[in-house]
């Protein structure tokens, strides 16, 4: 895949875009590729060029990418002010539980239905999903959908006001843990060591709740890209976005190693259109 300018809006011209209605709720979804389905959930403040780049990496690894528009301006490099406005709107949206621990965001119901639909459309063993930042925990809740097999949590940030809190109801968390044990599945998690939004306390809470079913990876702060878009420079003043804004797109970088581990995880659980027979 040729490198694009991450400082320019991404036209997303290589994705098929459509409206998908599930449970009476309609959202725009960008789809590309072939093979088993992987749902990529954007970080705040929306589908940036870096989020789209990650989706293309997943596509090129042999998967069908489903990238739902959950907030923000699709493909944009937003100003700090625009990004802050998107963040504030999402915090009070009925779809998200930004401040409350022990609750699951209502939008995860729609995302679980999307996983079920994607499995029907793409076939294969099941579906993978990755959430980032504001959506970071969503892939865990999506494990309540039987089609989901490969959840990845990248810098899960919610709830915002409880560093050790988990954005999932206790009953759903217990159900997910039971499924992980029964089916011998795991959850991958990623954060930077000095991330103030996704803390060590949160990863400790995941480990306590999920045991060795949670595989947490912590990257050194020195592995983070320091050249970021205005929103991140102003409002995210620490290493945070492992696979997008703070990823360094050079061979041998720890963030690239994290990307490759995730792609291998998807192939292990789902197979791919590039897997040998």
What are the residue ranges of the model-derived segments?
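N-terminal cap/leader regions of alpha/beta-hydrolase-fold enzymes
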Residues: 1-277
């Amino acid at each position: 895949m040729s490198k694009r300018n991450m400082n320019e809006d991404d036209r997303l011209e290589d994705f098929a875009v459509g409206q998908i209605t599930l449970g009476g709720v309609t959202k725009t979804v960008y789809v590309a590729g072939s093979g088993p389905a992987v749902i990529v959930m954007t970080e705040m403040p929306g589908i940036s060029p870096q989020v789209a780049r990650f989706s293309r990496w997943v596509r090129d690894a042999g998967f069908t990418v489903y990238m739902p528009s959950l907030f923000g301006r699709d493909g944009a490099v937003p100003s700090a002010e625009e990004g802050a406005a998107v963040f504030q709107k999402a915090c009070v949206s009925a779809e998200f539980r930004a401040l409350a621990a022990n609750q699951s965001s209502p939008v995860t119901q729609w995302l679980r239905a999307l996983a079920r639909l994607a499995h029907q459309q793409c076939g294969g063993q099941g579906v993978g999903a990755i959430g980032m930042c504001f959506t970071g925990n969503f892939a865990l809740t999506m494990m309540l959908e039987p089609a989901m097999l490969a959840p990845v949590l990248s810098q899960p940030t919610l709830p915002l006001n409880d560093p050790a809190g988990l954005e999932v109801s206790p009953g759903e968390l217990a159900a997910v843990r039971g499924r992980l044990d029964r089916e011998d599945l795991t959850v991958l998690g990623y954060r930077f060591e000095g991330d103030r939004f996704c803390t060590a306390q949160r990863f400790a809470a995941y480990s306590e709740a999920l045991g060795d079913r949670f595989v947490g990876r912590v990257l050194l702060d020195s592995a983070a890209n320091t050249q970021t878009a205005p929103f991140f420079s102003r409002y995210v003043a620490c290493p945070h976005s492992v696979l997008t804004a703070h990823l360094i797109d050079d061979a041998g970088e720890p963030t690239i190693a994290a990307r490759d581990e995730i792609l291998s995880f998807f192939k292990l659980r789902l197979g791919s259109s590039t897997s040998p027979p």
